[in-house]
Amino acid sequence: MAKRFPVEQFSSLTPRANDTSGKVRELVKNSQIVSNQADYQKENALFQQPDNGQTRPPTLFVVFGAQGDLTKRKLIPALYNLASSHHLPQEFVILGVDGIPMDTEEFRGKIRLDIQEMSPRPIDSTIKEWLLDRLYYLSGDFRNPQTYERLQTMLTELNARHGTQGNYLYYMATAPTFFAEIAQQLGAKGLVEHRKEFSRRIVIEKPFGHDLPSARSLNQSLREVLEESQIYRIDHYLGKETVQNILVFRFANGIFEPVWNRQYIDHVQITVAETLGVEHRGAYYEKAGALRDMVPNHLLQILAIVAMEPPNTFDPEAVRNEKAKVLRAIQPMNPVDVLQSTVAGQYEAGLISGRSVLPYRAEMHVDPTSLTETFAAMTLGIESWRWEGVPFYLRTGKRLNTRSTEVVIQFKSAPLMLFRKTPVDRLTPNVLTIRIQPDEGISLSFGAKIPGPKVQVGTVDMDFQYTEYFGDAPSTGYETLLHDVMAGDATLFQRSDSVELGWSVVDPILKVWESLGSHAIHFYNAGTWGPPEADALLAKDGRMWRNHT
């Protein structure tokens, strides 16, 4: 049977103009019927030709923290993938900056090995060498003003040599303690001055502060030397195709948006579950915990996309305005609400895929008496016409049963009246599941008659999987985001008000949990779905978590 594929929809590297007002319209226009994936790729020139360069401005990409894990595992592989798909400009340079003494040739040798190690597919040596030829290194202490004097000299030289036209992109792949310091030092040297003829942008990784006051302080420090339009606060979850597709799914399909409200939706679940423990991040995690690490950014950003109103246009500011409205409308919690509507947990020893794993307190760099939560669950409400009375259940945790990130929208059950004289005693509600990772896709469960002389209703699924329709393109989740920063498209990045609104949701919970001490933590065995108290959170409302097995 022929399948319908919207032109340009599912490429994470789709070229975008600086004016993104037609973003979703471009995703869904000119639909065509093709018989299979091969025909789709043949008929869609996007798979064969690079864009015309308008959204690939010359760029000098400066990575602070170039020797770190993020650079190795995410940034370099993403840049390699962009180069492979012809989505980097010819005038492109990478300058790594870090405190480890090393020259450019040594750094190139290291990155050559990193590319080989981190790629799940055979490496194209031509692409690899093209990228390595544009790679340079500067050794220096981030806190030393002399580092920025040498950086200024090197930027001038590389800009002239490679024709990057003064467009500098600074990526903070460092510990959060350096964010404000680096920005201030760059500002002191005039290296973030933004003009019409060239761009200067900064990308900042999470965490954006560790509470509301620190987030405000960081935003203030950044705005002393930068305009808000120059700051790109990155959340790699928003780079995932299935998260981006929520907007298309909602606003490009006439059958879903009319029922996307309190009249038809019973509740929403957002789950980010990991089977991994804290690994080598024990020291960081002791200061953060599951709530700080995941909720103000990943989970609340997904919630905002699910719950936002349609923007007037798909201009970046219009989209970000609507997301901010959702966060602003989340019902604030008082201490009693926190006690009744949140659960904190910590994993103990257990089995993951048949393998014994240590309890959190036995992990490296973790306090043996730690009260840091590795699991967080909560019920949130949104005070709006669309969502009044619809609970949003959020949970995230480590060492859980299955690695899964998904959004579950459960619709209200149909009335039973039609089937009152049949053996049917209950109707299963329709459930829409948006799988963000792994097995990216969307499924919808609905009732169907079981064959036979009696009227019996069973549940069946309509299921869409990205890989089945569009193949398995290499992606780290960073490709789209890096491409968008270079193009000046801030749609998928957090604005300062959204960051602070996220912390305003989390701060009251943190304060109550900290005041409770050991009484706040509920323990769970590794390999389960968290503490029983998380199940009770939904059970008291007559609902259940949707768990994979």
Walk through the language-model features, giving the residues of each.
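Secretory/organelle targeting and membrane-embedding segments
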Residues: 24-204, 208-549
